[in-house]
Amino acid sequence: MPARSAGVARSISSGSALGALAKLAVKPDGPISGYDRIADFGAAWTDGQGASDCQGASGGHNGCETRDDILRRDLTEVKLEGRCEVESGVLKDPCTGRTIRFTRGRKTSPAVRIDPMVALGNAWQTGAKALSKPVREQLANDPLNLTAADGPANDDKGDDDASGWLPQAAAGFRCEYVARQVAVKTKYKLWITSAEKIAMSRILGGCRGRVLPTESSHEVALKS
């Protein structure tokens, strides 16, 4: 299958998350073979006007690394070094409910990681392999698909989809998490597996009226 054009990522319109889920194609996972995070989705968090400068987002292409943009959006009590670098802040982790005090440093920064809600390995297996490299880089740096999260706890997720991993129920984030996954798969024309659809339907069925997030939703849009 030929690579799709760089402009394939569609703009999404707000509507029912359950309705959008019903429109996603259902297929088995493709093979993970050939997947290489850097070669296929670009290097993580590089600076400047390149691929890792929050593409497709309000406030993106601002010269700041994607990681700093997401930290600034999701943390409170943020302190900056210069215009971009987040030196410290507080994360109320949406996936575990824990409060984490973030301090930038070689040993301390991994306490907070940037989680792709649709894991890049999963994206590769469900259609991203056929996307052009620029669109895959956009996916990897799209704020719609990214959230700051507890680093060690996020290790458990790996490349699982919603049928294999979800945020802790007590944290109250599952509805938003799954709705964001549906939005990302809609935007980038990715498919879901039958088990994934069952898991997503179960979650969204418990939060009827959940609106599909868009690039301008308050939980997605970057801070200016």
What do the predicted segments below correspond to?
Residues C95-S224:
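Domain-level detector of nuclease and nuclease-like folds
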Residues M1-C64, S194-E196, G205-S224:
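N-terminal module-boundary/linker segments of secreted carbohydrate-active enzymes
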Residues G7-I12, L21-L24, E77, V86, ...:
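Residue-level detector of functional hotspots within protein domains
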Residues P31-R113, M117-A119:
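Secreted/periplasmic proteins that engage bacterial cell-wall peptidoglycan
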